Amino acid sequence: MITPAAYVGAAIAEIAGCFAFWAWLRLGKSVWWLVPGMASLALFAYLLTLVDSEAAGRAYAAYGGIYIMASLGWLWSVEGIEPDRWDLAGALICLIGAVVILIGPHEI
């Protein structure tokens, strides 16, 4: 099944793309950071089309939990800030919701 890989890839691409804008506007990096950033955001959008879902909104809703987990991973691994218990508790709640959306018996 391609859905888990598509969600993880989309999360990495979205976070990297958004971070390029953050780096430019908040960290004073060159405007050229936007070139790979925009390519990364385009890859993010493409990867979400690979998700096994009949409805875009449902795919995006389920993706939200994955995005939150990936964002906390970025926080820790790239920015060097360890997520606290509130970060982790909130992420767990969202991830449970994403799993319910993914595996629930939906009507088409």
Swiss-Prot record:
Protein name per UniProt: UPF0060 membrane protein Nwi_1459
Transmembrane feature ranges: 5-25, 31-51, 61-81, 88-108
A GO-annotated cellular component: plasma membrane
Locations listed in the record: Cell inner membrane
Keywords: Cell inner membrane, Cell membrane, Membrane, Transmembrane, Transmembrane helix
Chief location of this protein within or outside the cell: membrane
PANTHER family: UPF0060 MEMBRANE PROTEIN YNFA
Membrane topology classification: Multi-pass membrane protein
Cell membrane recorded as keyword: yes
Family recorded in the similarity comment: Belongs to the UPF0060 family.
One family name in Pfam for this protein: UPF0060
Keyword check for Transmembrane helix: yes
Species this protein is from: Nitrobacter winogradskyi (strain ATCC 25391 / DSM 10237 / CIP 104748 / NCIMB 11846 / Nb-255)
NCBIfam families: PRK02237.1
